[in-house]
Amino acid sequence: MTPQLNNLTLPIYMDYQATTPIDPRVMEAMLPYFTTKFGNPHSRSHSFGWEAENAVEEARSMVAKLIGADTKEIIFTSGATESNNLAIKGIAKFYSNKKNHIITVVSEHKCVLDACRHLEQEGIKITYLPIKPNGIIDLETLKNAITDQTMLVSVMVVNNEIGVVQPLKEIGKICREKGVFFHSDIAQGFGKIPIDVNAFNIDLASISGHKIYGPKGIGALYVRKKPRVRITPLINGGGQERGMRSGTLPTPLIVGLGMAAEIAYSEMEKDTKHVNYLFDRFLNNIHKRISEVYLNGDKNQRYKGNLNLSFAGVEGESMILAIKDLAVSSGSACTSASLEPSYVLRSIGIGEELAHTAIRFGIGRFTTEQEVDYAVNLICSKIDKLRALSPLWEMMQEGIDLKKIKWAVH
């Protein structure tokens, strides 16, 4: 049984960057397409197919509207990982006879970095841009990295680990002036912050359903039509999705993504106010009660549903065990199985000791003030206890610089 505490259900979900709970309105919209409206949207000879096709196209227009795109520019995929692979590898394969250079950032999602490493093995040159200590890229460094061989720049809008928001409008302007395609993994920002593909000069954008209170297993890739962007498909078959992504479309999941996008479009301002208020309440109350807690990533240029905090003198893994009533993460869900410190935190210059103490707290649409207050109280009480047991904390209080210690190897 799930324990109850003063009408509070435990454990409290605070891992909104890993996934979001499905909005009940999304589930309600999806259900008929599992049961009575089960037609194949590619069946053109009867009403079951027409009904499913209409639902798919309505969802497509909802997704497009949220980023200021044309309906025909939305290609449905299985999620942001596939979309990122399709965008990066698809551009590389189509244009490799003309250009052979791609630029990305050291702090991108693992699937972007891995797609780029795969292309390196095929002879494509990849530049991995560094980021500043606040997590933001330097625009001059980007400008200087672009050559006449550069075909694509790939920069995510909101970092999944530290929540910083990259200056997409400025990046897009540079790319357009230099005649380079601009791809952005917008999975963590879609439906949460305003994104306009035309104002930002974005040519390709990757979208995920389960990051915006929609179902898992569905995503989309925005592919610009004017000026036209061409990509080589990764999956061959029946030629669905304008030939870019073959396979029968999963109508229920697409309807869910569409409804999630529609809700985000109408409620983004309300969600933002709610999340910002809880972010400030969480962070201010933590800082009032315990010392040497650091917010990773820029405080202002960030999506405030993400609080990545380092607690000096406390191991992140032991902290997670101590606060088991909170569902949190010590890294991205894709890489946190590793005990290595986060590559994103290392890329902003955080030392190994502090990187190991980092925990990511996620705040979302369904997080309550009561949950935040409970989380703060629990964290503060456990931090005090863990620090009292920690020889590292004791050494820090005595002014010993842990970086200068030479540890014995056994």
Swiss-Prot record:
Q: In which pathway does it act?
A: Cofactor biosynthesis; iron-sulfur cluster biosynthesis
Top-level taxon in the UniProt lineage:
Bacteria
* This protein's record includes keyword Chaperone: no
KW Membrane (keyword) present: no
Q: Where does [2Fe-2S] cluster bind?
A: C334
Cite the binding residues for pyridoxal 5'-phosphate: A80, T81, N160, Q188, S208, G209, H210, T248
Q: Name one GO molecular function term.
A: pyridoxal phosphate binding
InterPro entries recorded for this chain? Aminotrans_V_dom, Aminotrans_V_PyrdxlP_BS, Cys_deSase_IscS, Cysteine_dSase, PyrdxlP-dep_Trfase, PyrdxlP-dep_Trfase_major, PyrdxlP-dep_Trfase_small
Listed A to Z, the keywords are: 2Fe-2S, Cytoplasm, Iron, Iron-sulfur, Metal-binding, Pyridoxal phosphate, Transferase
E.C. number: 2.8.1.7
Q: Where is the active site?
A: C334
Supply the PANTHER family for this chain.
Answer: CYSTEINE DESULFURASE (PTHR11601:SF34), CYSTEINE DESULFURYLASE FAMILY MEMBER (PTHR11601)
Q: How does it assemble?
A: Homodimer. Forms a heterotetramer with IscU, interacts with other sulfur acceptors.
Which family, according to UniProt?
Belongs to the class-V pyridoxal-phosphate-dependent aminotransferase family. NifS/IscS subfamily.
Full protein name: Cysteine desulfurase IscS
Organism this protein belongs to:
Rickettsia rickettsii (strain Sheila Smith)
